[in-house]
Amino acid sequence: MEEKKRIMSGMRPTGRLHLGHYLGVITNWVKLQNDYDCYFSVADWHALTTGYDKTEQLKDNVYNVVIDWLACGIDPKKATIFVQSTIPEIAELNIYLGMVTPQNWIERDPTLKDMAKILKSKEGTNSQIGFGLMGYPVLMTADILAVNAHYVPVGIDQVAHVELTRDMARRFNNVYHTDYFVEPSPKLNNCPLLPGVDGAKMGKSFNNDIKISDDEETTTKRIMQCITDRSRARKDDLGHPDKCEVAFKYWQIFGTPEEIAQVEAECKAGKRGCADCKRQLAQKVNEHFKEIRERRKYYENHLDEVKAILAEGAEKSRAVSAKILTDVRNIIGMY
């Protein structure tokens, strides 16, 4: 049997995950775990790059991320789930990669620019980029090359983030006259982006998100805040689903083809008011997450199982990374 190709991806534990994470990342991981050797990391070192002074909730955030993953269908029997900081080999590999990476590569990397924006939004215009944040792209590459992954699942707007990893792998291979590291390719996820309730990009810091862990009441309240067709003043006004900034986009994701067609037709005919439409939408979303919430509650009440999954994942991941690091040290000629 042909050996499965390896996939590496991760998330920073900066708070509870929202529906954007669910649709944009997790549902794709659930599919990939069936056909690939998947490694999914809770990137707690990366969380420190912009949240180094706010670590009180870091451990709880790690558990909540993993619980969300498990509840949404990530299967520890199919995928390796681990916490980044439990794999010290990543940190050592980060050093070696940093030695061969030109400074201008780092400065132009979009990942660093994105992280700098996050830091600026938190600390204001006088914020200073720390050494750890400057090295974010190198550490991200170390995460990927520590398991010598073939693919990195990303959205179309993140393809450039993988290019630096490819450049670094190629640079290491050229410097040390080897072909050891795979140049990982982006594996595109074509899921449409889910906007926040205000129509902007969904994000925890924007207070426009709907969290995976939200209960029915909270989810309904948030969906009732969703922006619809701004030009529609009365219930019987003819609607324009194509101008419905949020609610109809949610219908297109959570509704059946028949339901979507009905919503569109009734809206255009002025037979469906926006408030009623959002109430029905909330029912659909709550129905979709019913089993996920039940599984989430189970893992919240069985945290020992979550810890055991992470321990097993760390052991498996370290076995792979330790072998790779030994090879890297030998290639470089370390003592």
Tell where the protein language model's regions lie, with residue ranges.
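Short helix-capping/linker segments at secondary-structure and domain boundaries
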Residues: 103-107, 146-153, 255-263, 293
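Conserved nucleotide- and phosphate/pyrophosphate-binding catalytic cores
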Residues: 166-335
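A broad detector of the eukaryotic-type serine/threonine protein kinase catalytic domain
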Residues: 12, 46-47, 147-152, 207, ...
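Short capping/connector residues at structural and topological boundaries
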Residues: 12, 16, 53, 102, ...
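N-terminal Rossmann-like or analogous alpha/beta NTP/dinucleotide-binding catalytic cores
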Residues: 2-141, 297
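Structured ligand/cofactor/substrate-binding pocket environments in proteins
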Residues: 17-23, 39, 54-58, 77, ...
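A generic secondary-structure signal for well-formed alpha-helical elements
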Residues: 66, 73, 101-105, 149, ...
